Amino acid sequence: VLLHSPTYIGFTMSIENNGYRIVHSPLTRDADGVWRMDFDDMDRKIKENNIHVAVFCSPHNPCGRVWERWEIEQAMEVYRRNDCLVISDEIWSDLTLGNHQHIPTQSVSEDARNRTAAFYAPSKTFNLAGLIGSYHIIYNKYLRDRIGAKSSKSHYNEMNVLSMHALIGAYQPEGYAWLDELREVLTGNVDYACDFIVNHFDGVSCAKPEGTYMLFLDCSEWCQAHGVSL
């Protein structure tokens, strides 16, 4: 399974505990300090390891990138050329910062629409994680039937009445009004935190997240200066 690194530990545990092997394609920082996908590396890793499934995190956890349309289009073209199905985790899609906008993976092309299973939830944005209210959007009937068959193995893998109405309530106008205020507060917090870290901690850099409420710090210079190995 192709996975970008750094990665969310939940992906690692779920994939490995189900008997699959992870192949990482590292994200790299460009001259402006922005985390980017290495499309050539993705293509090479997929071919070398005969990979046919990839996990795509958008917005990215923990780097906080809200991928631009051209980036998603290019990634999906790599997956298309290699006949690679895509599991797109878009749980952070509502929680973008500043003027950044989330682009649904399935929206960039007809092929992306058909080879992608996209997963969403109000849990991160609206503090509803304990209510078990995630959902998927799958246009390809074959993929939808396969996932439905697997998820039916346990009757616990379903929404309950409380979680269903919590989801509906979160996606009402009042919920989005609250979300607008939350995004404004989080954007200010991120600006303050990143500026403070850069100005007070030598050797530690911080790429400002464009979404999520995660901060992913680069401490490599500090570690090298203090003889600490990574």
Task: Describe every region a protein language model picked out.
Residues 2-230:
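PLP-dependent class I/II
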